[in-house]
């Protein structure tokens, strides 16, 4: 019997969630600075993450920044919740993006791109040309942000498919989760 498209997508959600967890762990390990194609790209965990726990229907837990969400994130991950969505910021040179990455579907939501530069006051007032210029600049900004995440996902897939995943990467990820969970004050850990 042929599987439906939706059942195939649902069966593969784990990979995006593993990627998101690996990415957040890598940000912690490397201080958020990652070398990509000769540039230093800075990534940071934003002010909101959504975790999901299996079940029918699945239970969701949203952590919103009240200072530092990492300890509560660690406790939740240690208890088997899966990182489903995270707000991230990407900085490359002088440009900064903010977006929400959905790990289950590997989609981007609510991307905020860098501000467009000021217009040259001496330039002729050609609204159509200005609009087209702004549109092309905005499309290039989106392409750059997606390119960073594509590069990171490809790096994750190479590691995930290698022997290094079980030998080094997964144990390092588990150690990071344990360390985060130990940072939580006892009262917060009981509520996660």
List where the protein language model places each region.
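Intrinsically disordered, low-complexity, charge-rich terminal extensions
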Residues: 1-192
């Amino acid at each position: 019997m042929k599987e439906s498209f939706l059942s195939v997508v649902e069966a593969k959600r784990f990979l995006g969630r593993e990627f998101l967890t690996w990415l957040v762990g890598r940000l912690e390990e490397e201080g958020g600075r990652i070398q990509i194609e000769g540039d230093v790209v800075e990534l940071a965990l934003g002010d909101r993450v959504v975790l999901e726990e299996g079940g029918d229907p699945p239970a969701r837990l949203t952590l919103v920044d009240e200072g530092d969400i990492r300890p509560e994130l660690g406790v939740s991950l240690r208890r088997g919740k899966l990182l489903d969505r995270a707000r991230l910021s990407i900085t490359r040179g002088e440009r900064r993006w903010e977006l929400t990455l959905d790990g289950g579907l590997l989609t981007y939501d609510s991307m905020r791109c860098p501000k467009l530069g000021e217009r040259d006051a001496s330039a002729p007032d050609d609204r159509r040309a200005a609009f087209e210029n702004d549109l092309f600049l905005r499309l290039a900004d989106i392409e750059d942000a997606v390119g960073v995440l594509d590069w990171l996902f490809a790096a994750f897939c190479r590691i995930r498919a290698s022997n290094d995943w079980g030998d080094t990467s997964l144990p390092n990820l588990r150690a990071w989760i344990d360390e985060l969970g130990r940072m939580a004050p006892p009262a917060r850990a009981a509520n996660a």
